[in-house]
C-alpha cells in the first residue's frame, strides 16, 4: 500500500527490552523462523508446546525481521493478554489492540417463520473505539507497529485513501485560516464543545483551538497569530499542563467511514438508482409489501444522509460510499498495512477455521433481510472478507500452535519446533484409568493434591455431569467451584485467581479448560469420559487440555476411559514424544525443572492498594487541617482544570484525587481495565504532588 507517501513516517527499529534472554528451544526456533522468513517462505509453522514462550519468540522474531506485524488471535481476552505481553517486551514500539468495539451487539435480522424483524441494537465501548483509531493512526504514521487483532480485522472498514484524504496536517509557521480549520474539523466528524471537552471534540478560545483526536488521550493546542499557526502543543486535557511543543502533527478523522461531499453525492445517486431497479424486481414478483417496506426505509436513510451526512446502518451502503463495484471485497484493517507486513496467526488451529467461517455466517442473515425488503441487495457487500480474498491480501505468514491444523501443516514445508521450556518443566505424565469407580478414585487424587497445597482441574462432557460432580465433591468436604458458559468474563477471571490463591482447590468445567489458561499451581488435570470421541475429546482438544498441567513440576493427567481411542492414542503419543525430548535435554544440560512462579496479581489488586493509600493520604490531609473537608470534590477538580496543576492549592488537589478515584472504580466495574490503570497513574502523580506540598508545609 503506497498511500502514506505524503506522511512523514516515524522509522524506529523494533527492539525487545527484557531481563530474560532466549532459552530452551527459543534460540533455535528464532533463528530458523528468521531464516525461513528472510528466504521468502510464504507459510511457516511454529509447533510450540504450552509454556515454551511462543509470544516471546514472536517478539524476538519481529525484532530480527524488522517488519510491521499483524497478530491475529481467536478472542478479545487472549488479544488483550498478548498485546500486554508485547507492550512489555517492546516498550518503545507501537503495540496496538484492534477488536470489535461492541460491548453488546445484536445485528438486524428477519425471522420469516414468525414474521419477526429484529432491529440492530448495540453498545459501543469508547475506549476500544479509541484503540481501533490508534491502530490505524499508528499504521499510517510509523513502521514499527504491531497490531494484535481478532478476526474483526477482516470486516469492512473505511478506505485508507479517504481516511488520509480527510486528514489535516498542522505545521508550525504554516499559513492556515482558523475558521477554515474549524470547518475542516467538523467535516472530519469532530464536534465543537466548549463546555464538555472530551475525545472526539474540539473547543475554541479566541485564537486558540484545542482538539482531542479520536485515537488520543492527550489534547492538541493550536495557537494562531492571524492566519499563521504560531504554536502547536500537546497537553493534558484534565490539568491543562503542557507536555511538549510540536513542530508538525497529523489529525485523522473521527470516523473510519468518512466521505467528502462529492463522494456522498455520488453514493446517494447510486443508492437511488439501485432502489429504483430493486423496486421493479419486487413489484414484478408481486411482492408489494416488501417493495413498500424497502421504499420507506431507504428513502428515510437517503434523507438522513443528505441532511446529516450520516444515517443509522450507514455501513449497509458502504459499497456505494466506497465507490466499489457490487461483489468486490470491502476495505479492512489489512489495507492499512504496508505491502511487506508479516502476519502471525496465534492458536492457528482455532483462528484459521474462524476466518473461513465469517463470510457464510454473515451472508445467511443478510439474504433474509434482502429477500423480505428490509435492505437493498448492496447490503450484502457490507461483509467480512471471503477466504480467498483474505489470502490475496496477506503475505508471509507464521502460524503458532501447540496443535497445528491440517491446513497450515499442508501449506508449510515442515515446521519449526519449540518443545523445550526455559524453566526446564516437562510435559505431564498421562495415566489412563478405568471408568469403574472413577469418581471415588478422583476424590482420592484430589485429597492427595490438596494435602500438598496443589490444585486440580476436572473436565466433563456435559453441563449436567459437571453440576452433579460439583455437588458430590461439595458433599464430601472438597472446596470446589464450577466454571460454565454462563459465567461472565470478570467472574471467570476471579474464579481462576481464587483457584490459584487457594480459596478453593478444584475447578470443574466442560470446554473452558483449554487454550490460554495459565495455572502453575495445577498439578492434576482429570479428563472424564476421555474415550467418547467428538469435538471435546478430539486429539487437538486432548493435547490442549493436557497442556494445562504442563506448568507444574509434578504435573499429571488422568484420563478415565474403558478403551483407548485414536484421538487418545495420538494425544498420548505426542505428549510422550515431547516429554522424552524435554527429559533428554534436561539430562544433557544438567537442568533441574523449576516451578513456574507467576505472580498472582491483577488490576483489581492494584486498585485496592491504590485506594487504601489514597484514603490514608486524604485522612492525613484532613487531620492536618483540623478535620475540615474544604471544597467539594467537583469544585476542587474544576479549579485544578481551570488553573492548572502547578497553581492549584492542596484542597483542590484533594478534590481532584477523590473524583478520579471514583472514576477509576467506575472504569474497573465496567471492565475497562486499561482506562482504570491510566486513571490510577494520574492519581499516583497527583498524590505525589500533594505529598510534596505536605512535606513543604503548604498543605
UniProtKB/Swiss-Prot annotation:
Where would you find this protein in the cell? Cytoplasm
Q: What GO cellular component term, any one, is given?
A: excinuclease repair complex
- Where does this chain carry the motif Beta-hairpin? 101-124
Q: What does the function comment of this entry state? A: The UvrABC repair system catalyzes the recognition and processing of DNA lesions. A damage recognition complex composed of 2 UvrA and 2 UvrB subunits scans DNA for abnormalities. Upon binding of the UvrA(2)B(2) complex to a putative damaged site, the DNA wraps around one UvrB monomer. DNA wrap is dependent on ATP binding by UvrB and probably causes local melting of the DNA helix, facilitating insertion of UvrB beta-hairpin between the DNA strands. Then UvrB probes one DNA strand for the presence of a lesion.
Q: How does it assemble?
A: Forms a heterotetramer with UvrA during the search for lesions. Interacts with UvrC in an incision complex.
* Domain comment quoted from the record: The beta-hairpin motif is involved in DNA binding.
What is the designated name of this protein? Answer: UvrABC system protein B
Recorded name of the encoding gene = uvrB
